[in-house]
């Protein structure tokens, strides 16, 4: 592998956030999402037992889901045959299970969807959750993204795409706005926020960090990986917001 650096989550213990049996039925990206959602819920002082669960939803994006599951189960097919594949392979690997598991572990029974837009998945999820509240579909939304694809296939794929930095200096690896930048660092983790309708938040005395006042989303219609030169569509997206 040309790439020598990745941003791993160290010291994560799923059992601190969920029971062992539940954790065994999730891959890391789902575990991270559930842990982050529970932390966000606690930080927001949101008491789900006092909420209408049908007015609380979640939109959690994941660009890839679990490549590690695909690798592991494919090895089983080659070595032991297709009958030995884990019956939970599909629900372990598919991207929407981050949102699904957040719903299960928070008790949110409202809108539950997943956004898959590569590196923009988390931001798009927050924007779509904002819209759900704005349109009156929910009072509260868990929103964000989760990813865990530091595995042979993930590293090889992004390396072949020439998307990752090949520097061996951790201090000079992730420098996106530097003239010497050479790619990004493959990382993992989750980020979840609690979005809430303003009057609903005020009524329960929530500590409000910030207000989302706009959201824009569009596409370049240009190239599968490269942004259009000139940044016209990026500017248009900001204007839409």
Predicted segments, located by residue:
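A glycine- and small-aliphatic-rich helix-loop capping segment at beta-alpha/alpha-beta transitions
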Residues: 68-82, 132-135, 155-168, 229-233
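Anionic group-binding determinants
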Residues: 43, 124, 241
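Catalytic nucleophile serine of serine hydrolases
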Residues: 119-121, 216
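Short loop/turn motifs at secondary-structure junctions
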Residues: 54, 137, 207-208
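Conserved donor sugar-nucleotide recognition element shared by glycan-biosynthetic enzymes
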Residues: 95, 99, 122, 234
């Amino acid at each position: 592998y040309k790439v020598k650096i990745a941003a791993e989550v160290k010291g994560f213990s799923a059992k601190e956030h969920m029971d062992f049996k539940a954790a065994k039925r999730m891959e890391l990206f789902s575990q991270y999402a559930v842990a982050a959602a529970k932390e966000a819920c606690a930080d927001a002082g949101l008491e789900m037992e006092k909420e209408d669960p049908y007015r609380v939803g979640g939109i959690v994006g994941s660009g890839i889901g679990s490549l590690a599951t695909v690798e592991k189960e494919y090895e089983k097919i080659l070595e032991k045959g297709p009958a030995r594949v884990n019956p939970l392979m599909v629900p372990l690997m598919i991207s929407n299970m981050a949102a699904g598991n957040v719903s299960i572990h928070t008790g949110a029974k409202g809108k539950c969807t997943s956004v898959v837009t590569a590196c923009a998945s988390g931001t798009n999820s927050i924007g779509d959750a904002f819209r759900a509240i704005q349109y009156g579909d929910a009072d509260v939304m868990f929103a964000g993204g989760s990813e865990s694809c530091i595995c042979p296939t993930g590293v090889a794929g992004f390396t072949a795409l020439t998307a990752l930095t090949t520097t061996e200096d951790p201090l000079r690896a992730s420098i996106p706005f530097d003239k010497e930048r050479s790619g990004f660092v493959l990382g993992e983790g989750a980020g979840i926020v609690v979005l809430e309708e303003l009057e609903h938040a005020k009524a329960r005395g929530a500590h409000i960090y910030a207000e989302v006042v706009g959201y824009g989303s569009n596409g370049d219609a240009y190239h599968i990986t490269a942004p259009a030169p000139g940044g016209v569509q990026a500017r248009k997206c900001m204007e839409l917001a």
